[in-house]
Amino acid sequence: MGANGDVALSRIGATRPALSAWRFVTVFGVVGLLADVVYEGARSITGPLLASLGATGLVVGVVTGVGEAAALGLRLVSGPLADRSRRFWAWTIAGYTLTVVTVPLLGIAGALWVACALVIAERVGKAVRGPAKDTLLSHAASVTGRGRGFAVHEALDQVGAMIGPLTVAGMLAITGNAYAPALGVLTLPGGAALALLLWLQRRVPRPESYEDCPVVLGNPSAPRPWALPAQFWLYCGFTAITMLGFGTFGLLSFHMVSHGVLAAAMVPVVYAAAMAADALTALASGFSYDRYGAKTLAVLPILSILVVLFAFTDNVTMVVIGTLVWGAAVGIQESTLRGVVADLVASPRRASAYGVFAAGLGAATAGGGALIGWLYDISIGTLVVVVIALELMALVMMFAIRLPRVAPS
């Protein structure tokens, strides 16, 4: 019993998991790969699909914006609730199920309001599963290495992110732009993702057993989302400032086409190449973090500076290089940047931390997108100066962070 007599503690590691940590991470990564085929495939045609039902540009912008806000902002709710219930598998399965069900239905939605609701519901599914999923993964990553575990998961995710849009594009070409079969075929990878996830839950019902540290059991009272370590908040500040100076691919692609650097048909090809850079850099940064520690993250602000120096020129080679650098930065953001949270926050409050971190990351990304877009309209030279200033501030803040890193076994 705990000191107050109402919270039981147990030492994790008393029961050996049925799967090795690396196998758990790999299988979880395959689940993410299959799920990415589903929702990245759907997201690649969300705009045209809504337009086919009569949506205006404003409607598309509002619906997709609300969806992304829900995907990140609702984690402030789902994270603490997952910590309170300790039912991380249930939250993860529920979130994936919502995504797998809504995407095929989107293809047969006969009314605009139904399609809009399904687009938002799919993003809510990501909010439901996000903190719980990252918490489950963080336990196994304590053995593989935080950086390596999250990096392998992200690399597999990106394979799915490339396969999904290509699958949908192929189906549209075969069926003459029929959305129902193009999205209906995604039922197959979606069903496989859920089946594999349920199998993984049965094999490793308590992934926290990978960690050799005390953990709260039972049904503890809800952790206060704001009662998190000071170093965690400093890390959130570093992340926010970094993202304020990071442009979106939407703006990069706008520049490519509006300045006549690339034909519109070539933009998806460049994006696919950026996703390949994402996967490779995620692996490299993850392994580097486990070996060298926090200084690995110094690369992220530097990459953000290189993006604006290269991607907003009128030279096709420079723009392509800048886009590949953008993909590399995203790879670090989606892997190592998330993995560090687990080294800063103990298991009982980790889902809450992931919820807060994701919400802050989303707000900073949205703010950064608006800031970069506004500066782009004013002057590219001004944009470069402001981004350099922001990223230098982020570097200073990063070196003030003390990370109690857990070495891989």
UniProtKB/Swiss-Prot annotation:
The chain crosses the membrane at residues 18-38, 47-67, 100-120, 159-179, 180-200, 232-252, 260-280, 302-322, 355-375, 380-400. GO terms for molecular function: transmembrane transporter activity. The keyword Cell membrane applies. It is found in: Cell membrane. One of its GO terms (cellular component) is plasma membrane. It comes from the Bacteria. Keywords: Cell membrane, Membrane, Transmembrane, Transmembrane helix. Disulfide bonds: none annotated. The keyword Transmembrane applies. InterPro entries: MFS, MFS_trans_sf, Uncharacterized_MFS-type. It is a multi-pass membrane protein. PANTHER family: BLR5212 PROTEIN, CONSERVED PROTEIN. This is Uncharacterized protein Mb2288.
